[in-house]
């Protein structure tokens, strides 16, 4: 069955879906490859950051994440999403830019005493990175949406498939044309 969904690459759509706790837990569990037990958007936990040609949407969360010892650990999650192709050539430059933003825009998102995981969702390919989901430094995850189909991880691939811009409707780029069949029976994906 083919369905049309709002394109989550757009900030308003992405913000709306990530405000749903169940969707945020499903999405972040797939990215982090760890179970997110509970999640809360931080007060003032989203904003659009614009600097020259870079436009980034930022959300902050505090999450309880199941660790390897099967106990829960509170963690800050900072999620940055950009749909504009930036002149970021290397992940190190992107991470340096992120640190600059955090220093300049101390926004009080999250609890600074907690460990922080930063996730970058990029709607473009950067540098020579051929890995769709990469961890170039501890606590940093880069997701390159244009090459997500190359991921070998089925849960990441399924969740991130909702960003597949190859599904964009020709008539309206704000909509994606999605074959619902692969999600049949997966209650989290059906909800998403």
Ranges and model annotations:
Residues 1-192:
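Elongated, amphipathic alpha-helical interaction scaffolds
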